[in-house]
């Protein structure tokens, strides 16, 4: 009996680095579940990062949502069955997207929280853009799921944001920035955190379980694996 065809994954991309890591994770890990050279059908659409950031910097989340919905419409027409976005920051607009979306979404924070719970973590350090660290997307969902959380101090939040937008999204990865993130995460381990959320989809390209003072929750790869599992259901 032929195996049912996997669901078609639609990726609403934002930055090239995060989207590429998500796509590669799905394609790299699918063969272990599906067989050699196999992966679900995947379509991706992205407006340029600059278009998104014009709205983000103005706190115009409806504008961000409109871009995401435009991508969603294109992916629905391409045959996608559900959607993901490997970008934590633009998830702040998802509440405006979901009610008008032609397709269902996997939420990156829901998937991170599920993995954190399965590993028995209780208090999570949140790293990412300033918007992610200072906003409510992770904070509300983590509290609702029963977690405590902590974020870096104001100076560290500003520096991490600079690293992300001046370096990581442009494919620049330096030892200086890696060392800085290690120091920040190390300080948060002393605040009782038992794992760190890599809450920017480019941070896993700089920090991983080997280099991090705390166990990592790699939001990019977690979302990719959740999408792969959903496609195979």
Predicted regions: what they are:
Residues 1-233:
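Non-catalytic structural scaffold of enzyme domains
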């Amino acid at each position: 009996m032929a195996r049912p065809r996997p669901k078609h994954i639609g990726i609403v991309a934002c930055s090239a680095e995060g989207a590429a890591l998500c796509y590669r994770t799905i394609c790299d890990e699918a063969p272990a579940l599906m067989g050699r050279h196999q992966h679900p059908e995947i379509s991706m659409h992205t407006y340029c990062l600059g278009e998104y950031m014009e709205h983000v910097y103005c706190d115009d989340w409806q504008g961000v949502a409109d871009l995401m919905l435009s991508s969603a419409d294109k992916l629905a027409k391409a045959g996608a069955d559900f959607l993901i976005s490997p970008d934590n920051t633009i998830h702040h607009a998802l509440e405006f997207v979901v009610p008008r979306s032609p397709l269902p979404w996997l939420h990156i924070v829901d998937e991170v929280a599920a993995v954190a719970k399965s590993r028995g973590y209780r208090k999570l350090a949140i790293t990412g853009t300033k918007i992610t660290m200072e906003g409510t997307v992770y904070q509300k969902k983590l509290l609702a799921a029963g977690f405590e959380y902590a974020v870096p101090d104001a100076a560290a939040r500003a520096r991490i944001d600079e690293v992300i937008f001046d370096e990581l999204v442009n494919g620049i990865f330096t030892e200086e920035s890696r060392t800085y993130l290690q120091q920040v995460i190390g300080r948060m381990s002393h605040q009782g955190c038992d794992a760190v959320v890599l809450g920017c989809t480019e941070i896993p390209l700089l920090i991983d379980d080997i280099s991090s003072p705390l166990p990592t929750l790699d939001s990019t790869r977690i979302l990719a694996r959740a999408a792969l599992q959903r496609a195979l259901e």
